[in-house]
Curated annotation (Swiss-Prot):
Keyword Disulfide bond in record: no
Name of the protein: Alpha-glycerophosphate oxidase
Residues reported to bind FAD: 21-49
Family annotation (InterPro entries): DAO_C, DAO_C_sf, FAD-dep_OxRdtase, FAD/NAD-bd_sf, G3P_DH_FAD-dep
GO MF annotations, alphabetized: glycerol-3-phosphate dehydrogenase (quinone) activity; glycerol-3-phosphate oxidase activity
One Gene Ontology cellular component: cytoplasm
Cellular localization per UniProt: Cytoplasm
Protein origin, superkingdom: Bacteria
Keywords: Cytoplasm, FAD, Flavoprotein, Glycerol metabolism, Oxidoreductase
Length: 612
């Protein structure tokens, strides 16, 4: 179904002509998940996003749909149980996006190690039980030092005890967002990017009845009326709530910044994802992940108080990550000049709760008795021999027996929060990408109840555990063969097998629509046929309005295909200019914006300082 600049114009027109059941502010993964379930359940739904979809936070993750073995470092068993079950749901509803990618976790004999070999084995067994993969080919494996080095010969050998391999999944975070958005559009949601909420409309009882917004493409003010409004703006959540709390600061959010760096795989060859202690005795771990022909690594996890829209990679971030990777992979000798791309993102964390861990945290010491009791209790619960209450009690005992230290950014709760202010504004904040569907479901249950009680409108919430996103109409048990069949179809449209396979994996069950564009399109000047199809599909069916939308979020050109990017810049801008009828000035503006983003990702300014 078309989802284009014209779709956007019509959506804004319709939003101003009706009283929506629900207006969603924020088009990251949280807002996209809410929009899909609301529209599919029959609510008259609108969504506005001040940037491109996923631009703020949801395209800047570590790009995993992980089960959270790391949460077992804090023995947050309930979080892991929820996360692995939700990961399985995401595999069902978006089978073309998460791909299994077993993770290698080396264990070193050094101060501050997260796991000993024994505790790693227990944690992995517990993880497998929670994930339902015990006694399957996906079950964990304990590796000797020699087996670890056979898999990753460039790892540091000194102090290496062995390691483990456990099931994890890579993700295309921005694609997961746009596929949810497209499905919501197909189901009738009115959706527009580059529209910024500026204030609330209030009735005489100071209850929200809509939003004053601004179309950032035309600078026009827009009035959108809605029975209910939900704030899903991630790091911006406090700012939106501030509209009606002028002079009274709201500090629910405590954003932290995460940085990832990308190098050519030849500079840092890894055959599989690696998750390893930093070696700095700081309680943290880093991922080193192969993607395309590149390797990326991260993340940092530091408190952030700067510009929410433009978090930057600093020299301190670069030095921290390069130091860790060069220590763990002694032959790499990476410098800042080896970095081809990068990204900095903000995690929309909730302040005041250190129960859950993201990247190590600082949870103090745990006695062996507490550890063993928790493991035994959880195993009994999984085998239906003990109650959930017993698990909760054991977890509380762990928490009280842990000497809690100063609140570390890495130990801020990744849990979600769903609140309603006195003016009626709902705010859904926090959480992890993996949990987006469950968060949306919880919010919609309440919203549907309020619509019934306060407005006399009845809706039945869809079963979102089986409701596929756009592109996800593939048998989850047969993903590889179905995508291969789509690729074969692409070759009949004149594409090479490699190009057809690339498009099939990118678009899933939408691939035939992409291939069908060959009936009206030929390869544009300077672009391959596959690139031309992908670009036009992005403009007409994915609301890509700017070159940065296409290069950074609809595709991974800017992150993991840097070698071929420069040759595509001018041809893509020329093709977009024809499509959108841009003036010469607009073309220049779009190219300048793209080159600024590329320079930021390339760390050109930091590299320039090194040369001075």
């Amino acid at each position: 179904m078309e989802f284009s600049k014209e779709t956007r114009r019509l959506a804004l027109q319709k939003m101003q002509e009706r009283d929506l059941d629900l207006l969603i502010i924020g088009g990251g993964i949280t807002g996209a998940g809410v929009a899909l379930q609301a529209a599919a359940s029959g609510l008259d739904t609108g969504l506005i996003e001040m940037q491109d979809f996923a631009e703020g936070t949801s395209s800047r993750s570590t790009k995993l749909v992980h089960g959270g073995l790391r949460y077992l470092k804090q023995f947050d068993v309930e979080v892991v149980s929820d996360t692995v079950s939700e990961r399985a749901v995401v595999q069902q509803i978006a089978p073309h996006i998460p791909k299994p990618d077993p993770m290698l976790l080396p264990v070193y004999d050094e101060p501050g190690s997260t796991f000993s070999m024994f505790r790693l084995k227990v944690a992995m067994d517990l993880y497998d039980l929670l994930a339902g993969v015990s006694n399957t080919p996906a079950a964990n494996k304990v590796l000797t030092k020699e087996e670890v080095l056979k898999r990753e010969p460039d790892l540091k050998q000194e102090g290496l005890l062995g390691g483990g391999v456990y099931l994890d999944f890579r993700n295309n975070d921005a694609r997961l967002v746009i596929e949810n958005i497209k499905r919501a559009n197909r189901d009738g949601a009115l959706i527009a990017s580059h529209v910024k909420a500026e204030d609330f409309l209030l009735d005489d009882k100071r209850q929200i009845i809509g939003v004053k917004a601004r179309d950032l493409l035309t600078d026009q003010e827009i009035i959108i009326k809605a029975k209910l409004v939900i704030n899903t703006t991630g790091p911006w959540s406090d700012e939106i709530r501030q509209f009606s709390h002028k002079g009274q600061p709201i500090h629910q959010m405590r954003p932290t910044k995460g940085v990832h760096l990308v190098v050519d795989r030849q500079k840092l060859p890894v055959s599989q994802p690696v998750y390893v202690d930093t070696g700095l005795n700081d309680g943290r771990m880093v991922f080193v992940l192969p993607r395309e022909e590149k390797t990326y690594f991260g993340t940092t996890d530091t408190d952030y108080t700067g510009d929410l829209q433009h978090p930057q990679v600093t020299q301190e971030d670069v030095d921290y990550l390069l130091g860790i990777v060069n220590n763990r992979f002694p032959n790499a000798n990476l410098t800042i000049n080896d970095i081809e791309s990068s990204w900095a993102g903000l995690r929309p964390l909730l302040s005041g709760n250190s129960a859950s861990d993201y990247n190590g945290g600082n949870s103090g010491k745990l006695s062996d008795d507490s550890f063993d009791h928790l493991i035994d209790t959880v195993k009994a619960y999984i085998n239906h021999e003990d109650s959930r209450e017993a698990v909760e009690k054991a977890i509380k005992q762990v928490e009280t027996s842990t000497s809690e230290k100063e609140l570390d950014p890495s130990a801020v709760s990744r849990g979600s929060s769903f609140e309603r202010d006195e003016n009626g504004l709902f705010t859904l904040a926090g959480g992890k990408i993996t949990d987006y569907r469950k968060m949306a479901e919880g919010a919609l249950k309440v919203i549907i109840q309020v619509l019934k009680e306060d407005f006399g409108k009845s809706f039945k919430l869809i079963n979102s555990t089986t409701y596929p996103v756009s592109g996800g109409e593939i048998n989850p048990a047969n993903v590889d063969s179905e995508l291969e069949a789509y690729a074969q179809l692409g070759t009949l449209s004149g594409l090479s097998m490699d190009d057809a396979r690339y498009l099939a994996n990118l678009y899933g069950s939408n691939a035939p629509k992409v291939f069908a564009l060959t009936r009206q399109l030929k390869a544009a000047e300077g672009l391959s046929l596959a690139e031309t199809l992908s670009l036009h599909y992005a403009m007409d069916y994915e609301m890509a309005l700017k070159p940065t939308d296409y290069f950074l979020r609809r595709t991974n050109h800017l992150l993991f295909m840097r070698d071929s990017l420069d040759a595509l810049i001018v041809p893509v801008i020329e093709e977009m200019a024809k499509h959108f009828d841009w003036s010469t000035d607009e073309k220049v503006k779009q190219e300048e914006e793209l080159r600024r983003v590329i320079a930021e990702n390339d760390l050109s300014a930091l590299k320039g300082q090194q040369e001075d």
